[in-house]
């Protein structure tokens, strides 16, 4: 029914084309049910989801929206500095679509410059975020330590992929936890938040931002290739119920 509605809407000015497409759709659907080429057939039942308004998201989109929500709650502009790297690049692409929410995106010449620009944005009062994957996190480690010693809020997104070294851009892996916890020189502990699903990526990004702003510290947000590119229906939250993210200007 939803597909038929989409076809009718798509070809509203060409009803004959819409009719032909619906006929082809039903023919293919009925063929799959009646053909005797398969020993077993099954029907995928409709998912038993709680009532609500849903949209389909992947982890990178959910994470991006969580950052935007945190910035709006804190009444801050959002700055995202990044260098393209699979599978984190789509966060830059998604955030660049939302300039109307006072989102500033910056594609730097390398990973170190992206992190340094984000530290500068944090110093000027933005909710500053930099994103990368495993090898990029290694390059950013000195700048992360700088933000820590300067007590500047900064969210570092690490969408993990197969490693070590440059690794395998399209292979899912969750092998950067120890590096996220301890991969900096000197005594430089910081919080680490991890997303477990595409929809949870929204809340993980929001929480990482809240912690960074409240405690004036860098926070590493871990995702991975599977979460980033996997998708699921997401029940849109009531943003009024989200914790308020404090602004640095509110912290004495």
Please place each PLM-identified region on the residue numbering.
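Intrinsically disordered, low-complexity serine/threonine-rich segments
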Residues: 125-127, 208, 250
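Acidic active-site catalytic centers that drive phospho-/nucleotidyl reactions
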Residues: 110-111, 224, 250
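Short, glycine/acidic-enriched loop or turn micro-motifs at the edges of active sites
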Residues: 85, 227, 250
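Thiamine diphosphate
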Residues: 2-182, 189, 195
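Single conserved hydrophobic/aromatic residue that forms the stacking wall/gate
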Residues: 243-252
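Structural signature of the thiamine diphosphate
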Residues: 22-36, 190-242
């Amino acid at each position: 029914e939803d597909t038929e509605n989409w076809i009718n809407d798509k070809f509203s000015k060409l009803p004959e084309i819409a009719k032909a497409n619906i006929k082809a759709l039903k023919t293919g659907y009925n063929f799959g049910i009646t053909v005797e080429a398969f020993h077993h057939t099954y029907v995928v039942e409709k998912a038993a989801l709680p009532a609500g308004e849903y949209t389909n998201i992947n982890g990178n989109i959910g994470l991006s929206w969580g950052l935007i929500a945190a910035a709006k709650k804190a009444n801050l502009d959002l700055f995202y500095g990044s260098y393209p790297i699979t599978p984190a690049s789509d966060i830059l692409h998604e955030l660049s679509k939302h300039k109307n929410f006072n989102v500033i995106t910056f594609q730097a010449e390398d990973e170190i410059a992206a992190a340094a620009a984000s530290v500068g944005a944090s110093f000027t009062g933005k909710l500053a975020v930099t994103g990368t994957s495993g090898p990029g996190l290694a390059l950013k480690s000195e700048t992360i330590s700088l933000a820590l010693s300067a007590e500047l809020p900064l969210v570092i997104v690490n969408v993990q992929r197969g490693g070590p070294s440059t690794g395998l851009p399209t292979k899912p892996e969750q092998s950067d936890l120890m590096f996220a916890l301890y991969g900096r020189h000197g005594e430089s502990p910081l919080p680490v938040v991890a997303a477990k699903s595409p929809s949870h990526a929204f809340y993980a990004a929001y929480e990482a931002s809240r912690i960074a702003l409240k405690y004036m510290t860098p926070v590493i947000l871990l995702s991975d290739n599977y979460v980033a590119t996997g998708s699921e229906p997401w029940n849109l939250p009531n943003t009024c119920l989200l914790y308020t993210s404090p602004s640095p200007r509110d912290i004495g």
